[in-house]
Amino acid sequence: MSEVQREELNYDVVIVGAGPAGLSTAIKLKQLDTNLSICVLEKASEVGAHILSGNVFETKALDELIPNWKELNSPINTSVTSEDFLFYTKTKSMKVPNFFLPNVLKNHGNYIISLSNLCKWLGEFAENLGVEIFPGFAASKLLFDNDQKVVGVQTGDMGLDKDFKPKDNYEPGINIKGKV
C-alpha cells in the first residue's frame, strides 16, 4: 500500500486543546510576540463544547492575562456573595462556622461561571489577537524528528468505516508542525 499524502501546515507554536490552559497559553504568547504564528487544535466541534462543568472562579490569573476583562463583555459576572459549608451525616447536616474554614475554602469575591462560556470567550479573544483555532480536529498522533524530538501532531483521518478502512469520502489527517 502506498504512503498516504498528507497536507502539512507549519506554525511557530502548536497547542493541543482549547481549554482554559491552552487558550491562555496562546493568548499570552501572542501578547508577548504578535508575529508568532499560533495554532490551537480542538477536538470538539466548537470551542467549549467538551467543557460541561461549572466553576467557582478566582480571577487573579485572568487579571494578569487580560487586565480589562471586565470591560470586554466576558461571561464572568455572577460574584459569590454568600457561602455555607455543611458537614453531612447519614441523617442530618450541620453548618460549619466560616471562621473554622481555611482561606482556600472561602470564595467570597470569586465568581460562579460556566467553563464552557469562559472557553468560548477566551477563544474569541485569542482569534482577535490572530491565533488560529481549528475546532473539530483531534490530534491523533505525535510527530517526531530524527532526534525523537516532538515537532508536531497529526490530526485524525476522516471518512473511515468501522474497521478503519477508507470510505469514498476519506480525507487523510493533516500534519501540523510547530517550532515550539
Name each model feature, range by range.
Residues 1-2:
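N-terminal mitochondrial targeting presequence
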Residues 5-7, 174-175:
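Short, flexible hinge/linker loops that cap or flank conserved catalytic cores
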Residues 22-30, 62-66, 153-162:
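Short, well-ordered amphipathic alpha-helices
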Residues 38-44, 178-180:
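Extended hydrophobic secondary-structure segments that form protein cores and membrane-embedded regions
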Residues 43-92:
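N-terminal FAD cofactor-binding segment of flavoenzymes
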Residues 76-79, 84-180:
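Feature captures the FAD/FMN-dependent oxidoreductase FAD-binding
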